[in-house]
């Protein structure tokens, strides 16, 4: 919800700015937004899972390290921090071919505020054929675990999956809407896990 006086104030500032200088305000907004994301994400996690009060950032930690710190999960060996560095880097690299990146780029191309651009991308990410697919995959894995009372053996899992496919349902999280080969992000996560 935008306060009218701020909207008018922002417009007054932008009117005195040459179009060739818009990048300065955009850069400033972008840096501010990126700086706030770890605290925002960690705060949502802590609120959603009743983990207590907000944890303040640590100025001695990097972007991923602060996210891990503010979530509040133990990370004595630093593996969670390294995993989050990898995860965030791999998911920040989107050229514009998917829904969230395309929506963000489209809104930004109208010289909209970076906050609106990121919001557009997040709204696209919420769809079942994009980011929500990750949640559907996790639900599927947890439902398999519940059905079998733990991790099923290979044969039971194979029968369960074939039964699901033969009934016309999909197995969430497998395959990619665009790629026709292994997702390189998946390969990077497997390599990290094996180390």
Where are these regions (language model features)?
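Single conserved hydrophobic/aromatic residue that forms the stacking wall/gate
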Residues: 1-14
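Glycine-rich, mobile lid/loop segments that gate access to catalytic sites or pores
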Residues: 15-95, 105-106
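Conserved phosphate/anionic-ligand binding catalytic regions in large, soluble enzymes, centered on
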Residues: 36, 97-99, 109-141, 170-184
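Amphipathic alpha-helical interaction surfaces
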Residues: 40-43, 93, 124, 128, ...
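Flexible, glycine/charged-enriched surface loops at secondary-structure junctions
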Residues: 48-54, 79-81, 95-102, 132-135, ...
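Active-site-adjacent structural elements in folded domains
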Residues: 69-75, 85-90, 100-111, 119-125, ...
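Cytochrome P450
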Residues: 142-148
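A structural-propensity feature for long, helix-poor, extended segments
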Residues: 148-193
């Amino acid at each position: 919800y935008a306060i009218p006086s701020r909207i008018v104030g922002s417009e007054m500032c932008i009117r005195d700015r040459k179009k060739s200088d818009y990048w300065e305000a955009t850069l400033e907004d972008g840096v501010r937004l990126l700086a706030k994301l770890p605290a925002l994400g960690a705060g949502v996690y802590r609120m959603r899972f009743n983990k207590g009060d907000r944890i303040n950032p640590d100025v001695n930690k990097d972007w991923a390290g602060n996210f891990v710190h503010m979530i509040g999960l133990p990370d004595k060996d630093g593996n969670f921090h390294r995993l989050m560095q990898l995860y965030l880097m791999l998911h920040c690299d989107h050229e514009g071919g998917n829904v969230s990146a395309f929506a963000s780029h489209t809104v930004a191309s109208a010289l909209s505020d970076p906050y609106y651009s990121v919001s557009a991308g997040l709204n696209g990410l919420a769809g079942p054929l994009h980011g929500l697919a990750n949640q559907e995959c996790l639900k599927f894995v947890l439902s398999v675990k519940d059905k079998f009372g733990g991790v099923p053996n290979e044969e039971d899992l194979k029968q369960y999956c074939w039964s699901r496919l033969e009934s016309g349902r999909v197995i969430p999280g497998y395959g990619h809407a665009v790629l026709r080969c292994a997702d390189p992000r998946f390969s990077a996560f497997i390599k990290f896990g094996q180390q």
